[in-house]
């Protein structure tokens, strides 16, 4: 926990990046981690063991060759827009309200904050439900359900969270290219999604050993 907090402080104060604790926490704890950030000073952390090879799968990381330079505003816009939606309901964050609140006030929220902010808020609620499903799938060894939820999560990130490419540089979409190639290579036998905060960097890919050669060749 302390390592993650130190890493976050370094990113926030030294590098000027408005990052949260999720990536740092996952790195410091290791493996698959379910985290509840209700209390950011003392998040609830659960390490969930999973052996991909026992399910006939391998996990790899694909470097999209896109760096994170000049993306601070893109990252900062996500929490800013989500908090704006929450603020309409006099809440500090979206976990204090519900999806129904947003749906019932859709018109005024779209008018005041724009469609992207509303879509990102809807992603937040649905993604939190998916996290519970993902954790349940791993705890009970329902690996196919886990893969399905990962793909759903990636699809939602692309359409609703919109963190695959920077709108300020839409001609460069390396993450989108990598996802398209990965999905084709997997042939519906695995999962892929954007990694971390998105916009650049890497994508994780889970592929079956039965298509290992073809997948690696295509990628």
What are these regions (language model features)?
Residues 2-24:
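Glycine-rich, mobile lid/loop segments that gate access to catalytic sites or pores
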Residues 1, 22-25, 82, 106:
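Detector for methionine-enriched segments
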Residues 12-15, 33-193, 205-211, 216:
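C-terminal nucleotide
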Residues 19, 24, 193-202:
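Conserved phosphate/anionic-ligand binding catalytic regions in large, soluble enzymes, centered on
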Residues 29, 55-56, 199:
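Short, well-ordered loop/turn elements at secondary-structure boundaries
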């Amino acid at each position: 926990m302390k390592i993650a907090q130190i890493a976050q402080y370094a990113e926030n104060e030294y590098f000027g990046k408005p990052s949260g604790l999720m990536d740092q926490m996952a790195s410091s704890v290791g493996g698959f981690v379910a985290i509840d950030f209700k209390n950011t000073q003392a998040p609830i952390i659960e390490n969930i063991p999973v052996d991909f090879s026992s399910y006939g799968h391998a996990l790899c990381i694909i470097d999209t060759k896109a760096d994170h330079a000049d993306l601070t505003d893109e990252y900062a816009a996500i929490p800013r827009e989500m908090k704006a939606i929450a603020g309409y309901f006099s809440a500090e964050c979206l976990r204090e309200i519900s999806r129904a609140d947003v749906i019932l006030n859709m018109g005024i929220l779209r008018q005041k904050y724009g469609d992207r902010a509303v879509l990102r808020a809807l992603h937040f609620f649905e993604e939190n439900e998916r996290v519970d499903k993902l954790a349940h799938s791993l705890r009970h060894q329902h690996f196919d359900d886990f893969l399905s939820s990962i793909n759903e999560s990636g699809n939602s990130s692309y359409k609703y969270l919109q963190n695959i490419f920077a709108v300020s540089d839409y001609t460069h979409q390396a993450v989108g290219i990598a996802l398209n190639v990965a999905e084709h290579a997997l042939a519906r036998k695995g999962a892929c999604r954007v990694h971390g905060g998105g916009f650049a960097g890497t994508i994780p890919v889970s592929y079956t050993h039965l298509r290992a050669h073809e997948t690696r060749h295509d990628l």
